[in-house]
From Swiss-Prot:
Annotated keywords: Cytoplasm, Endonuclease, Hydrolase, Magnesium, Metal-binding, Nuclease
Lineage: Bacteria, Pseudomonadati, Thermodesulfobacteriota, Syntrophia, Syntrophales
Catalytically driven reaction(s): Endonucleolytic cleavage to 5'-phosphomonoester
Needed co-factor(s): Mg(2+)
Compartment list: Cytoplasm
Protein name as annotated: Ribonuclease H
Gene giving rise to this polypeptide: rnhA
Amino acid sequence: MKATSKAKTHPPGATAAKDPQKQVIIYTDGACLGNPGPGGYGVVLLYGEHRKELSGGYRLTTNNRMEILAAIKGLEALKSACSVTLYSDSQYLVNAINKGWAQRWKANGWKRNAREKALNPDLWERLLELCSRHDITFVWVRGHANNKENERCDVLSKEAAGRADLKADPGYP
C-alpha cells in the first residue's frame, strides 16, 4: 500500500495565475551527515520530456532545513506559475504545509505556541512566498521504498552533503 498525504495548498490571500498547460512534478529530499552536521538537498524536476536535477548544501545545518530548502530550490527553478505536485519523504515539510502549521507559525510571529519559537522561519518564509505563486499539491512518500525519483533525490542530497567545498548556512545559528 502506498502511503500518501496530499492537499492543495495556498497561503491565505494567494492568487497566483496558473497556466494549466504547465504541469510540473518535483521530487525533493534533504540529508544531514550528523544532525546538525554537513547537509545537502536533492531535487528532481519533471516537465513533459524535460528533466532537471539540482543539489547543494551547507557545512553545518540540519536535516529539516535541507528538506525545506530542497522544496524551495525546486520551486525557485520554475520560470512561471505552474501546477505542481511536490513529493517529499519529510513529514515535517508536508505536514507543515498541508496542515497549515507554517502559515499559523507565521501569523503568530514565528511562534509554535506561547513558549516555543518555530524553527527555520527564514526558510518557511521563502517557501510560503513561493507557494503563493503556484498551484501546489504536497504529497508525502515513504522514503527508501523503491520510489525511483525519491531515491535519486536521496543520492543527490547525500552527495551534496559530502562535498568538501560547502559554505556556511546563513540561517543556521
